[in-house]
Design a protein with these regions (language model features):
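Amphipathic alpha-helical scaffolding segments comprising HEAT/armadillo-like alpha-solenoid repeats
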Residues: 151-162, 184-185
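Ankyrin-repeat helical core positions
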Residues: 162-163, 179
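Amphipathic alpha-helical substructures
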Residues: 1-83
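Residue-level recognition of alpha-helix boundary/capping or hinge positions
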Residues: 1-5, 119-121, 144
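Generic helix N-cap/helix-start motif at coil->alpha-helix transitions
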Residues: 35, 164-173
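Structural detector for internal amphipathic alpha-helices that build alpha-solenoid repeat scaffolds
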Residues: 169-183
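Beta-strand-rich binding/interaction modules
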Residues: 52-53, 63-141
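Short acidic/polar inter-strand loop motif in beta-rich domains
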Residues: 141-152
């Protein structure tokens, strides 16, 4: 299951076209002999023409996983949603900070706004310009992140997300979050 999640994270990072272009290269280059993680990494790096050492260092060879907490603040005057993302897992020489992409999805009265961010620090704030006040917010749209996420959702927001989120992973996550705080659906 861990290798599946690693591939899932890599697909999120590279995108479908590069990820799926790398798979045949890996299979053809390594046909009929044992393979290792560096063989997989080399095939994917050759396909995307990028250095993925940092990715494999944290997801394949590293210890642990990211634990993320976020807090939001709506600045009505600037029409900007500020999202502070904090990595809460233990960080030391053996457990470094993680680096990972995340999609923020915000629904307003008239639009759906998606913003791609790259989380790489212990705590950082991202500004998302919006046409109007946010009605719904989703951190990690699609549920790609291999880690845990906690946020400043109210019970009402979680209940709305559980019933009406745009994807099943969001609805499932909201139900689990409601269960964790003792809400019964």
């Amino acid at each position: 299951a861990l290798l599946e999640r690693l591939a899932h994270q890599l697909r999120r990072l590279l995108g479908d076209s590069l990820f799926w272009a790398g798979m045949p290269r890996f299979l053809v280059d390594n046909a009929y002999h044992p393979v290792t993680t560096p063989d997989y990494a080399a095939a994917m790096e050759q396909t995307c023409h990028c250095d993925l050492d940092w990715f494999f260092d944290q997801w394949a060879y590293g210890i642990g996983y990211p634990r993320v907490a976020f807090a939001r603040h709506w600045d009505a005057a600037a029409k900007t949603l500020h999202v502070t993302v904090t990595q809460t897992q233990p960080v030391d020489s053996v457990h470094p900070l993680f680096r990972f992409p995340v999609t923020l999805r915000v629904i307003t009265r008239d639009s759906v706004v998606r913003r791609e961010i790259m989380v790489s620090r212990a705590s950082e704030t991202f500004a998302v310009a919006l046409p109007a006040e946010p009605l719904s917010f989703r951190f990690d749209e699609g549920g790609w992140l291999l880690g845990t996420v906690a946020g400043d959702y109210s019970e009402a927001e979680l209940a709305t997300m559980a019933a009406h989120d745009l994807d099943v992973r969001g609805r499932d996550w909201a139900v689990l979050a409601l269960t964790a705080i003792g809400m019964v659906l």
